[in-house]
């Protein structure tokens, strides 16, 4: 079992020698809102930005416990994936190959909040929560390829409630009537002011 995982040695990410000019842009929101598309658009427009796709970690990392294997279905509820994301972020920062890390992820539980938002509090972070009217969100979910529609719809109320009750310092962007590029532009303008 590697460090930082359940039963292993807990890492202290705040005391690492982390790059001072690094920024993290958290693209947050419920499932199907367009986090990945917006994050990809941002990375195309910011030199030396790096996209770290949380969803891609499911291909790379496998469950380490029965609760991860058989527990809640959404990836952010699986501690081993959140721990893997922490490790990936730390590695990218320490390598120093980029100065802006863009991470689309639904930060919809206390473990994500603690490990990711609080865990990297010593790095300049910009947290954006994307929202949309419910009917528009349902349309987006139904029109996406490679989307687990049942998962997205099932956990939407829980995700929406968590995001509404946490992260009061995050910037909320209603994407209902916005294109992907216009959302990306608004985020970039916000962090460069």
Language-model segments: which ranges?
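Glycine-rich phosphate-binding loop used to anchor ATP phosphates in small-molecule kinases
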Residues: 80-121
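Conserved phosphate-donor/acceptor-positioning beta-strand/loop module used by diverse small-molecule
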Residues: 122-140
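Walker A/P-loop
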Residues: 36
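P-loop (Walker A) phosphate-binding loop of NTP-binding proteins
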Residues: 30
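Small-molecule kinase domains that catalyze NTP-dependent phosphoryl transfer to phosphate-bearing small molecules
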Residues: 143-186
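Hydrophobic anchor at the beta1->P-loop junction of P-loop NTPases
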Residues: 27
């Amino acid at each position: 079992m590697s460090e930082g995982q359940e039963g292993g040695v807990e890492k202290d990410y705040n005391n690492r020698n982390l790059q001072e000019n690094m920024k993290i842009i958290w693209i947050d929101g419920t499932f199907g809102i367009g986090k990945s598309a917006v994050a990809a658009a941002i990375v195309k427009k910011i030199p030396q930005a790096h996209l770290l796709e949380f969803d891609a970690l499911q291909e790379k990392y496998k469950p380490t416990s029965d609760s991860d294997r058989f527990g809640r279905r959404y990836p952010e509820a699986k501690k081993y994936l959140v721990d893997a994301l922490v490790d990936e972020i730390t590695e990218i920062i320490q390598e120093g190959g980029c100065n802006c890390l863009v991470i689309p992820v639904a930060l919809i539980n206390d473990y994500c909040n603690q490990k990711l938002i609080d865990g990297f509090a010593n790095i300049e972070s910009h947290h954006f929560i994307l929202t949309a009217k419910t009917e528009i969100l349902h349309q987006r979910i139904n029109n996406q390829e490679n989307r687990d529609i049942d998962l997205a719809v099932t956990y939407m109320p829980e995700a929406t409630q968590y995001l509404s009750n946490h992260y009061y310092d995050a910037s909320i962007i209603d994407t209902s009537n916005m294109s992907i590029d216009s959302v990306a532009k608004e985020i970039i303008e916000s962090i460069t002011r």
